[in-house]
Swiss-Prot record:
GO molecular function, one term: imidazoleglycerol-phosphate dehydratase activity
Subcellular locations according to the entry: Cytoplasm
Organism, scientific name: Rhizobium meliloti (strain 1021) (Ensifer meliloti)
Record's protein name: Imidazoleglycerol-phosphate dehydratase
Keyword vocabulary terms for this entry: Amino-acid biosynthesis, Cytoplasm, Histidine biosynthesis, Lyase
Amino acid sequence: MADVMPSRTGQVSRKTNETAISVSVNVDGTGVSKIATGVGFFDHMLDQLSRHSLIDMEIKAEGDLHVDDHHTVEDTGIAIGQALAKALGDRRGITRYASIDLAMDETMTRAAVDVSGRPFLVWNVTFTSPKIGTFDTELVREFFQALAQHAGITLHVQNIYGANNHHVAETCFKSVARVLRTATEIDPRQAGRVPSTKGTLA
C-alpha cells in the first residue's frame, strides 16, 4: 500500500490588545480564499497570494484600524507564517528552493525562497509614493518580514523595474506566491526525506 501523505494544513488564532486574527491554510489546496481584514487593498493582495500559491487561505482579522493599518497587516503576516509553519511540519519531502522573475505590464519583480526553517528577509523594493490609495506602501515590507520570520523561510524580494506602485506591490505578492507554490510542493524523488544533508531543517 502506498504511503499516504499527512494533511498539510495549519490553523492559528492570535489575539492581542491590538488585533484578533484567525488563519487557516491548506498547502495542498487550489488557491481558494476567504479573506476579511478590513483593509481593502491588503485583502486584494492576500487573495493574490492564495490564488497564485494554490494555498487555500481563510483569514479573518479585526484590528485597531482607527489608529492605522500597521498592526493588522503585521499581525496577519505573523499568523499566516505561523499557520504555514504548522502545515509544513518538518518539511519532509518538499522541493525547498524556488525563484522566479514575474512580469506584470511594465513591472518586473524577482523572488527567491528557501523553505529552510531559518527566517530571513532580503528586501530590495522601492515605492515612489508613500501610499497606494489609503494603504501605506511601507506595510508591504512589514507583511513579508512577519511572514518570513514566523514561517521560518529565507525570502529575497527584488523589484527590478516598474513605474506603477500598485503593480510593484502586486508583483511582490504574486512572485512570492509562485515561489511558495514551487518550494512547498512534494518532490517524489525525495522519497519523504528532509531536503538537507543535515537531516533536519532549522
